[in-house]
Amino acid sequence: MNNLVNLLDLDADALTAYCGELGEKPFRARQLQRWIHQFGASHFDAMTDLAKSLREKLATRAEIRSPAAISDHTSSDGTRKWLLDVGAGNAVETVYIPEDTRGTLCVSSQAGCAVNCRFCSTGKQGFSRNLSTGEIIGQLWMAEFAMRAQLGRGPKDERVISNVVMMGMGEPLLNYDAVVPAMRLMLDDNAYGLSRRRVTLSTSGVVPMMDRLSKDLPVALAVSLHASNDALRDVLVPLNRKYPLAELMAACRRYLEFAPRDFITFEYCMLDGVNDGVEHARELLKLVADVPCKFNLIPFNPFPESGLKRSNNEQIRRFAQVLMDAGIVTTIRKTRGDDIDAACGQLAGEVMDRTRLAERGKFGKITPLVPVADAGAPREARPA
């Protein structure tokens, strides 16, 4: 049995405490952290400014281990996707998205997902387990140095990865105790040194944990909205049955008191004939009237057995125009990496279905998609 401590699991405070257990002073923790997260060291003998006695001690008690890559694919548009082995037959995906002015890494927080959004292929895989802090920050550690080896650093010695979005597989706020320490490392000047504005957590709306995050580590927030009323969202995002839209909007307003940005980003997957009507856009205007926000419209990426279709471009433009005419900043996400199944909603792990009905049951049973004509029915009038 491996009893070595994985130092990727430790944020600054935990690493300082660990060094204390070894009889070392706090500055050793900062040295270790820089070697690991800024220089990509994976072996202690490379850490030449540490005392030889400490290096020998660490070699017998600790390790630096990120998930191993099963596959590594690069899209025609430069998007790069890694499939990572997290043990017991589970795999997660990490995606690097290059842009002219930044490089964004999409990080997974769970193996599978229990929320089971209707339009997301990851949810169809089911839920296996939460990732550890080391498995989460290990994705950034692995990707940063893989991309640096490929591209080098920028002309001003800037990092290849300038932004991180917790938008990969899983619901981050259902793995709070591992996600927050990982994000602390993303922000730490002795690690990755990202600003809170450059780290975005995307949630389907776990209201109590949104409130907790606002106090503990208020990074930029994106909310997977995808519907303009409770009847429709109950079906598209089953978590809505536990935390309906009124509660979610109130949580968004509370979060903005602490957020590094003065708006919430609402993500909205455009589904043909389901949630893409002009009437839905107008309903959204009423819903978010007192929530400073921007909208990111996401063309649906089809996958087998979804039973859904992508809205056509003209319908997406009409929908966006309603929002923009009301003064809401609205973007239409450019589909990236779809030729390697790295586009939004396609992160399914390329592994066998690991459906966990008990986990999904926490958010209510899955019902057939509500027809558009019925989507605005009062909650008490809808089918159970």
From Swiss-Prot:
Active-site residues, as the UniProt record annotates them: 93 (proton acceptor), 344 (s-methylcysteine intermediate)
The keyword Phosphoprotein is assigned to this record: no
Binding site for S-adenosyl-L-methionine: 170-171, 202, 224-226, 301
Keyword annotations from UniProtKB, A to Z: 4Fe-4S, Cytoplasm, Disulfide bond, Iron, Iron-sulfur, Metal-binding, Methyltransferase, rRNA processing, S-adenosyl-L-methionine, Transferase, tRNA processing
Catalysed transformations (reactions): adenosine(2503) in 23S rRNA + 2 reduced [2Fe-2S]-[ferredoxin] + 2 S-adenosyl-L-methionine = 2-methyladenosine(2503) in 23S rRNA + 5'-deoxyadenosine + L-methionine + 2 oxidized [2Fe-2S]-[ferredoxin] + S-adenosyl-L-homocysteine; adenosine(37) in tRNA + 2 reduced [2Fe-2S]-[ferredoxin] + 2 S-adenosyl-L-methionine = 2-methyladenosine(37) in tRNA + 5'-deoxyadenosine + L-methionine + 2 oxidized [2Fe-2S]-[ferredoxin] + S-adenosyl-L-homocysteine
Record's function text: Specifically methylates position 2 of adenine 2503 in 23S rRNA and position 2 of adenine 37 in tRNAs. m2A2503 modification seems to play a crucial role in the proofreading step occurring at the peptidyl transferase center and thus would serve to optimize ribosomal fidelity.
UniProt similarity note: Belongs to the radical SAM superfamily. RlmN family.
HAMAP family in alphabetical order: RNA_methyltr_RlmN
Record protein name field: Dual-specificity RNA methyltransferase RlmN
Organism: Cupriavidus metallidurans (strain ATCC 43123 / DSM 2839 / NBRC 102507 / CH34) (Ralstonia metallidurans)
Organism classification: Bacteria, Pseudomonadati, Pseudomonadota, Betaproteobacteria, Burkholderiales
Gene: rlmN
